[in-house]
Design a protein with these regions (language model features):
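Canonical P-loop GTPase G-domain recognition
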Residues: 111-162
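A short macromolecule-binding patch
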Residues: 20-27
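Residues located in well-ordered beta-strands
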Residues: 3, 53-57, 178
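Helix-rich effector regions associated with P-loop NTPase G domains
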Residues: 27, 33-48, 58-75, 80-81, ...
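A conserved segment at the C-terminal end of the G1
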Residues: 164-180
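Short aromatic-glycine-enriched beta-strand elements
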Residues: 10-14
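Short, Lys/Arg- and Gly-enriched loop/turn segments at beta-strand edges
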Residues: 49-57, 85-87
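Structural detector for short beta-strands of small beta-barrel domains
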Residues: 1-8
Length: 292
């Protein structure tokens, strides 16, 4: 048995306990149109010391669609303090996706050597998320981050230029990844990761998936204007205290517990509520388009 860590030119690179094998899929898999993805646990038969054949894909614990990776246990959202400015709606979009999929969410704020912003830590710790402040300009990797990754299969997510590839390089110094600089003109990362790949971190017995930089992540299926609040942990249970109960969408209704209790008490950060409203509007537009 092994884990698919990379797809390249029609080959599946499978990490077993003793070797890294370059594999093709067995014919019955191709006929069944079953395609292994990065993160899959597979049954593999070695042909020699470096090549093998994938015979079966074991049942998946979960499957992320974007990035396409299977059997993930947590999502680490990497965001920069500056250059580029933190896109908190993107951070919250990823965290909502993690909540829907039942994955643990962690937020890592990179480039804290450029500008310390403790208020960002407070926003997400208040929501119950683990927040790590660090700098990727010098080794070794923050011990707090290694503790979070230990024994997990983690996906690194975040927009281009925030330092995901730099983080993987810091965790795995032997790797030769292209590190993206942020273009002064476009504020986008350059020369960044173009594919999903799992990297094994021997120091903490973990797998980390570096993902292509993106500026937008599609919301998972099943989200509605009624259940979106369930995926904001600080809003759990608020609806039962709203005047309109399950019909309250927390966007201006009279007697809304979120607006009359959570926000005034600072139990929910205004930035998170702003993200909620933005995502709520997006979900509403999706619902309207489905019923046209």
């Amino acid at each position: 048995m092994g884990r698919v860590i990379r797809l390249l030119a029609g080959y599946y690179f499978v990490q077993t306990e003793s070797a890294l094998l370059r594999c093709r899929a067995r014919g019955k898999l191709r006929l069944a149109e079953e395609t292994p993805v990065v993160g899959d646990l597979v049954e593999v038969s070695a042909l020699n010391e470096s090549e093998g054949v994938v015979g079966r894909i074991l049942p998946r614990r979960n499957l992320l669609e974007r990035p396409l990776v299977a059997n993930v246990s947590q999502v680490v959202v990497v965001a920069a303090m500056t250059s580029p400015e933190p896109n908190l709606i993107l951070v919250d979009r990823v965290l909502v996706a993690a909540e829907v999929l039942g994955l643990k969410g962690v937020v890592f704020f990179n480039k804290t050597d450029l500008h310390q912003r403790e208020e960002l830590r407070g926003i997400y710790e208040k929501a119950g998320y683990r927040v790590i402040l660090g700098s990727l300009t010098c080794a070794p990797a923050p011990s707090e981050l290694l503790d979070v990754l230990r024994g997990q299969t983690s996906v690194l997510a975040g927009q281009s230029g925030v330092g995901k590839s730099s983080l993987v390089r810091l965790l795995c110094p032997e790797l030769d990844l292209a590190v993206g600089e942020v273009s002064a003109k476009t504020r986008q990362g350059r020369h960044t990761t173009r594919h999903v790949e799992l990297h094994y971190l021997a120091e903490c017995e973990a797998f980390v998936a570096d993902t292509p930089g993106f500026s937008r992540l599609d919301l998972p299926e099943g989200l509605t204007t009624y259940n979106l609040a369930e995926y904001f942990p600080e809003m759990h249970g608020a609806r039962e205290h709203c005047r309109f109960g399950g019909d309250c969408r927390h966007r201006g209704e009279p007697g809304c517990a979120v607006q009359e209790k959570l926000l005034p008490s600072k139990a929910m950060a205004p930035e998170r509520y702003k993200s909620y409203l933005a995502l709520l509007e997006e979900v509403r537009q999706q619902e309207r388009s489905r019923y046209k």
